[in-house]
């Protein structure tokens, strides 16, 4: 192996170490919370079956009658979302704000019985989703997750380079050498697991980044475009549909997040863009009319209805379907019942379709239990890689030292590294900025602070 190859190997190893040091805790958290959310379809019926299922009957109450039953039980509650029964044995769900709390009220759609409530933000799935998306600390958490995902991409790329056989036998490359012990065994386990999971992990990282607040938003603004003519005849506000999505609840599909929210009725003519009236709306059409409209438009069951909260607001019917080809987002005038926008899969451009498909694969929903098992396997491989990586580091680190891989003095002016850093900075600006910071710390501080021999 030439001096330059040896030098770049050490450089890749050093950056792989730094990436792993930062990424590993986040990857463990993302894998664990991802597993919880992955099995939501199985866990929810087991944990909340008494709230979610009802005996089927011949006649159901209207959506407005169901809402009245929910309000009678919780008169201070203000409706923020309605989820009609997805099938004949499902309860109706009303997400309501009550005294500062956001809770879901479950109603038997046939008998009008209030089955119970659930804190909409303080249940297993909501907590797992909030941790997975923003660590439950808002924007700062979102940026940290984005950084971790970006560094994860670098971790995978550098890991594949370090794994590359370079004339070695398949043993320890394509499968671990189970006859070995100690650090060599853990290194084999780490390298082989990382190799087999590399491509799938990249798909998971990149599809997940589509939801991040900084990179994901810029990505959507750049690539996710609808024909301007779709909105030319519709009065719109300065708000985008992304306001309907929260850390704990998904309402509209990713493809709709950067689309404008239409406004209702005569208020559209007098609206001051960017300033929405604070007073709640008093819609003239009934909730059942919106349900009937969704049925007539063949919206797939499992959709939600978000009512207007202002005099200019609209009803939004949205389904974030397991198969994105069944996605639908409808905005309905609260006064006339006119459909102001009806956006489906066929309206998405190629990038939006690819991203929506990636998101559904990411969440394990696209191909049923097969998709779930594949994502579960990826999560388990992430956990195994993280644990084995920590064990390798622990076994090779010198006493009292950090164990940073040695930096050779014959590196060729960091040219290759600078090209990689520049590429990552362009694709992932936050990652690029953090790379510069870590590079400076490594050159000016860490390389001197921990300058001691290290076993390869």
Question: How should these model regions be labeled?
Answer:
Residues 1-456:
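Conserved histidines in hydrophobic membrane contexts and catalytic metal-binding motifs
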């Amino acid at each position: 192996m030439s001096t330059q190859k040896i030098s770049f190997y050490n450089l890749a190893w050093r950056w792989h170490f730094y990436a792993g040091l930062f990424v590993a805790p986040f990857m463990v958290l993302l894998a664990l919370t991802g597993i919880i959310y992955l099995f939501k379809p199985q866990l929810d019926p087991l944990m909340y079956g008494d709230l979610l299922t009802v005996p089927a009957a011949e006649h159901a109450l209207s959506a407005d009658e169901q809402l009245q039953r929910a309000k009678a039980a919780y008169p201070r509650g203000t409706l923020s979302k309605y989820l009609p029964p997805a099938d004949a044995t499902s309860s109706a769900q009303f997400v309501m704000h009550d005294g500062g709390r956001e809770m879901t009220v479950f109603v038997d759609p046939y008998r009008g019985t209030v089955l119970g409530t659930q804190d909409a933000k303080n249940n297993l799935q909501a907590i797992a989703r909030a941790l997975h998306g923003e660590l439950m600390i808002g924007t700062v958490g979102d940026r940290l997750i984005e950084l971790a995902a970006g560094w994860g991409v670098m971790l995978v790329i550098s890991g594949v380079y370090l794994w590359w056989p370079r004339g070695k036998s398949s043993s320890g490359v394509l499968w671990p050498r189970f006859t070995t012990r100690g650090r060599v065994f853990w290194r084999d386990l780490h390298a082989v697991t990382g190799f087999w999971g590399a491509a799938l992990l990249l798909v998971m990282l990149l599809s997940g980044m589509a939801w991040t607040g900084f990179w994901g938003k810029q990505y959507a603004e750049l690539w996710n475009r609808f024909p301007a003519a779709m909105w030319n005849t519709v009065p719109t506000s300065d708000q985008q549909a992304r306001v309907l999505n929260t850390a704990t609840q998904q309402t509209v599909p990713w493809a709709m997040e950067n689309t404008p929210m239409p406004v209702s009725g005569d208020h559209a003519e007098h609206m001051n863009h960017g300033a929405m009236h604070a007073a709640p709306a008093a819609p003239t059409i009934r909730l059942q009319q919106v349900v009937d409209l969704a049925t007539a438009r063949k919206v797939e069951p499992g959709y939600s209805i978000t009512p207007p909260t202002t005099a200019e607001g609209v009803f939004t019917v949205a389904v974030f379907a397991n198969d994105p080809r069944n996605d639908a987002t409808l905005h309905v005038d609260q006064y006339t019942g006119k459909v102001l926008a009806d956006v489906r899969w066929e309206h998405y451009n190629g990038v939006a379709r690819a991203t929506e498909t990636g998101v559904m694969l990411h969440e394990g929903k696209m191909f049923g239990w097969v998709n779930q098992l594949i994502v579960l396997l990826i999560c388990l491989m992430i956990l195994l890689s993280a644990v084995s990586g920590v064990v390798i580091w622990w076994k090779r680190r010198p006493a009292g030292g950090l164990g940073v891989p040695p930096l050779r003095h014959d590196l060729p002016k960091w040219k290759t590294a600078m090209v990689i850093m520049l590429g990552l900075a362009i694709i992932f600006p936050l990652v690029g900025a953090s790379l510069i910071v870590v590079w400076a710390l490594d050159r000016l501080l860490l390389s001197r602070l921990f300058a001691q021999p290290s076993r390869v």
